[in-house]
Amino acid sequence: QQVPCDTFDNAVLAMRAKNPSNDREFPMYWEMKRIAPGESNTFFFSAIGMTGGVRFSTKNPAVYHTFALRNGEQVWSEIQPGHVTNWPVITGHIFEFGFPDALLQMWAAYFAEREGKLGDRFGCATVAEVVNSHKAFAAAMKSHETRSEISI
């Protein structure tokens, strides 16, 4: 017997966001896939503009892709930088970066941020960022339910 599912398997959120420095709007798309054939706990990041962009996936963390517009042609390049961590590691850059390394980097960022020693490195997700993420997903659910645009 099938059980009704009350969650979304896959979702695409199409939004408009404003640049706070000049109030210009730009399109923003968030895509979530709970069911993604061939993927297992894979995170993707993609930022594509009119003349450039970047793509990254945890499925192949040793590379990232860049997009550029050159002489009217769209050019994608694959960059293999090796890994350079924000915080020193015992194994160094000649070995493959793995889950334990990622976990230690997260802990290092947390404690550095807590002690005010983060410097120019990325910090942990803030409470405000989490709240805003929940607002976006709640608006998406309401938009789906009402078949209308929801302002946040």
Predicted regions mapped to residue ranges:
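Glycine- and charged-residue-rich phosphate/anionic-cofactor binding loop of Rossmann-like
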Residues: 113-132
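Short, charged, low-complexity loops and linkers
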Residues: 85-94
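Short, charged alpha-helical segments
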Residues: 101-105, 125, 132-135
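C-terminal hydrophobic helical "lid"/dimerization subdomain
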Residues: 130-142
